[in-house]
């Protein structure tokens, strides 16, 4: 196993096309990509035929309700705005350190935007699950989508 650090959208597709067996995305990364189709297109390109994509991310419900205490709600489930906010982990630091952590920009997607992007970019959806918030189990907090690269 090798670890490569960098912007996945800048990956060398001549070198890494159909190179990866499984892409595992955990803990909220989709909102860092402003164009989900561009992101899913790259994921498809780097996966081998029949490769698996596992996306475990914050539930889009957190766009309107801060069910995970992320301090990042946008106010509208259907908002397509890109907004500036703290990185999700910043809230775990002292205020002094928290102030020094750079802000980043977000684009939060709806469930249909996520699923449709996977489908448009060559994945079949094998499983989709929603998970309760760890703050209030009556509310959705995360989801897991599992897709297979179509040959």
Residue ranges and their predicted role:
Residues 19, 49, 122-124:
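Short loop/turn motifs at secondary-structure junctions
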Residues 113, 117-151:
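C-terminal lobe and adjacent flexible extensions of AdoMet/dcAdoMet transferase-like proteins
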Residues 9, 13-23:
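A short acidic, Gly/Pro-enriched loop at the edge of an enzyme's catalytic core
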Residues 37-52:
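A short glycine-rich, Lys/Arg-flanked "PGG" loop and its adjoining helix->strand segment in the class I
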Residues 53-116:
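SAM-dependent methyltransferase
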Residues 11-13, 63, 135:
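Generic structural signal for helix capping and beta-alpha/helix-loop junctions
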Residues 21-36:
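A short SAM/SAH-binding and catalytic strip from SAM-dependent methyltransferases
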């Amino acid at each position: 196993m090798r670890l490569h650090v960098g912007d996945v959208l800048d990956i060398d597709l001549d070198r890494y096309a159909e190179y990866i067996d499984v892409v595992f995305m955990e803990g909220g990364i989709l909102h860092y990509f402003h164009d989900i189709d561009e992101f899913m297109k790259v994921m498809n390109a780097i996966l081998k035929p029949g490769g698996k994509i596992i996306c475990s991310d914050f539930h889009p419900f957190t766009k309107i309700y801060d069910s995970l205490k992320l301090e990042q709600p946008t106010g509208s489930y259907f908002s397509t705005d890109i907004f500036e906010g703290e990185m999700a982990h910043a809230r775990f630091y002292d205020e002094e350190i928290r102030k020094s952590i750079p802000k980043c920009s977000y684009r939060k997607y709806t469930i249909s935007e996520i699923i449709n992007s996977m489908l448009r970019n060559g994945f079949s959806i094998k499983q989709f699950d929603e998970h309760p918030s760890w703050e209030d189990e009556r509310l959705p907090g995360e989801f897991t989508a599992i897709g297979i690269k179509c040959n």
